[in-house]
């Protein structure tokens, strides 16, 4: 996974190369350019309602702006995901917007889930097409679950399950 794209960290690092702050305004913390598509990775330490207030709109905007350049989706990482953030990202994956050239897909993951995903993805040598398949599944399920009157929790569970199905 990491070896198949051009991965750029926009975060601030110390003299040893360790991250000390997230990216400045207007950009994702990490951008993975896989040629045919990009992934914007956003990381936060915020929790609860503050997580939604601080991250909901900015993360959607960052990924939306990235999507204006071509196919893209986002991964949002937090130690503990706020239910309101999951709901916000579910809704953004349903709504077709002109301003961002379509639906803005952001997949929320807890830090523990992301670490497990990343370790297994590296071990399996996950390909860019596999990553894009996760994005396509997310968009397909958000639309399907809307019509089936399912919730953001159902969508999120389905996407995380798909991720680990690809890795098994």
What is each residue range found by the language model?
Residues 1-167:
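Catalytic core segments in nucleotide and nucleic-acid processing enzymes
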């Amino acid at each position: 996974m990491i070896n198949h794209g051009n991965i750029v960290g926009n975060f601030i690092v110390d003299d040893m190369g360790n991250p000390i702050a997230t990216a400045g305004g207007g950009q994702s913390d990490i951008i993975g350019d896989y040629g045919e598509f990009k992934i914007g990775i956003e990381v936060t330490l915020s929790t609860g309602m503050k997580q939604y207030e601080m991250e909901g709109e900015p993360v959607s905007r960052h990924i939306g702006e990235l999507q204006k350049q071509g196919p893209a989706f986002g991964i949002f990482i937090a130690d503990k995901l706020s239910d309101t953030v999951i709901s916000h990202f579910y809704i953004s994956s349903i709504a077709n917007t002109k301003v961002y050239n379509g639906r803005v897909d952001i997949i929320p993951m807890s830090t523990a889930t992301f670490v497990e995903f990343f370790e297994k993805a590296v071990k399996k040598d996950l390909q860019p097409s596999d990553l894009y398949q996760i994005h396509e599944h997310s968009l397909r399920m958000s639309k399907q679950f809307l019509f089936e009157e399912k919730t953001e929790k159902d969508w999120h569970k389905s996407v995380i399950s798909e991720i680990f199905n690809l890795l098994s």
